Amino acid sequence: MKKGGGRNKGFPQDDESSISLRQLMVNEGLIPSLEDEVKRRGVINQLRKIVVRWVKNVAWQHRLPQNQIDATNATILPYGSYGLGVYGSESDIDALCIGPFFASIAEDFFISLRDMLKSRREVSELHCVKDAKVPLIRFKFDGILVDLPYAQLRVLSIPNNVDVLNPFFLRDIDETSWKILSGVRANKCILQLVPSLELFQSLLRCVKLWAKRRGVYGNLNGFLGGVHMAILAAFVCGYQPNATLSSLLANFFYTFAHWQWPTPVVLLEDTYPSTGAPPGLMPIQLPCGSHQYCNSTITRSTFYKIVAEFLLGHNLTKDYLKLNFSWKDLFELYPYANTYTWFTKIHLSAANQEDLSDWVGWVKSRFRCLLIKIEEVYGICDPNPTEYVETYTKQPNIVFYWGLQLRTINVSDIESVKIDFLKNVNSGSFRGTVGRIQLTLVKASQLPKNGECGSNNRSKKVTKTCWRIREDKQCNNVPVYSKHLPGYVVGYQKMVNREADGMEVKC
C-alpha cells in the first residue's frame, strides 16, 4: 500500500465538514452504545469459556493422556463487522471457533458442541448449516445473533489470541479450514495496514451506510459485501494517512469513480505478483494470501450500477469544502420507482415465519442464477436487495422488486425465466420445509404505495442464507456414539424421514 496525500491543513471547512459528518453518523445510529459493546464482549468471553470446556471433554472422549487434556485449548476469534469494530446495534457477531487436530467438525463440532450450546439457557434459535461453503452453527446468545464456523489446526492447543498469519499454525490444514480462516486473516491484515484505526472505522461505517441506502450492498444480489467495502476503505486510508474523515470520504468516491476496472484493488502491492488475469469485473485482492481475491458475484448489471453510484457519489462530494454543503444527499435512498418502468416481482411465502426465514435464505443463495437469466432475457436488471412484506396477505411472505431498464417488455418471457430458476432452486439440498415462489412482472405504477424504498414497510432484518436442521415430525433423533469410547453418546443428530424427501417447489 502506497502512502501519500495529506490533510488539508489550510481549510477550517475541512474540520467543520468532518464534524457535520460525524453528527450525521450519530443521528443515523451508526455508533453503538457502551452497553452494546459490553454485552457483545461478554458474549465472546462466554463462548471462549464454553469451547474450552468442550475441547477438554472431546480430548477425554478421544482418550488422550491426562497431561494433554490439561494442556489442550480452543478459542474464539471475532471477525467481520464486529472484528473490525464497525458493528451496529442490530449487527450480529461473526465468531470463528478454532480447535485442535483431534476435534472433528462432523462429530465434535456439529454434534458435541452444538448440544453443549443448546443446553445453555442463554442460547436460542440454534441452527446448523452443514452444506454451505462455510459450514457453521447459527444461534442467538443473550438475544445477539452469532455465526460460528469452525477451523481445525494441526496443533494440540490453540493459544487464546492465536496468530492466524503465522505459517506455523497454517501448515497442513484442510481446505475448509483454510477458506474459513481467510476472513479472519483478512480482518487482521486490514487492521495492521490502516494508519489510523479510528478514521478507518468511521470511513467504513459511512461507506457501508451509503452502499445500503443506494442499493449496492449485498453479495447475494451481485453487489459489494462487507469484506469488499473494508478493503476499499483501507485502500483509501493508506493513500491519505493524515486526512480528515470528510476528506477520506470524498477521496473514496473520487478514487473509485475514476478506477480503471478490471484493474484489481491491491492493498499490498508487489507482495504477491499476479501470474494471470484477475477474476471478475471488479477484482479486489485479499491482503493475506497469494493470488487470493474476494469472492465476487458481480454481474454486468450490478457492475454498471456500482460504477454509476461511485460517479454520483463523487459528484455529490467533490464540493464538500464549500459553504452550506450537506452530506445528506449522499445517503438518500435510491429512487427505484422513479427510475424503472418495469419490475420483476419475486414473492416468497411459507406456512409460518420460521419456515419463511429458512426458505428465503435458501432462495437468496440462488439469486445470482436468477439475475443472470433475467439479464439474458431482459437486459440490464437492478436487483434491489430490500426485503418487503405484503401486509394484506395472511401467509408470511417476503417480496423483492428488481428494476428492469427496458421501457417495453414481452411479459410472456417471464415464463422461461421462472422455469429456469425453479430448476435451479430444486437442484440443491434444501433441508427445510419447501415454500412457494411467484415470479411476475409489474409496472412501476402497480407498485404498492408502501412498497417503495424508504417506506415503513421495509423489513428491518435482512434474511441470511441459512436453513435450519428441522426439528419437527419429519425428523428423528438418532444418538451418535463416540468413535473412541464405544457406548458413549456424544449427542443426537436430526435425521430427515425418507418420505419427506423429494419435495419440489412450484409456483
UniProtKB/Swiss-Prot annotation:
Subunit structure: Monomer. Forms a complex with cleavage and polyadenylation specificity factor (CPSF) subunits FIPS5 and CPSF30.
GO biological process, one term: mRNA processing
Family: Belongs to the poly(A) polymerase family.
Enzyme class: transferase
Any one GO molecular-function label of the UniProt entry: metal ion binding
Lineage summary: Eukaryota, Viridiplantae, Streptophyta, Embryophyta, Tracheophyta
Gene transcribed to yield this protein: PAPS3
This protein's name: Nuclear poly(A) polymerase 3
Nucleotidyltransferase is among the record's keywords: yes
Free-text remark on how the cofactor is bound: Binds 2 magnesium ions. Also active with manganese.
GO cellular component, one term: cytoplasm
Species annotation: Arabidopsis thaliana (Mouse-ear cress)
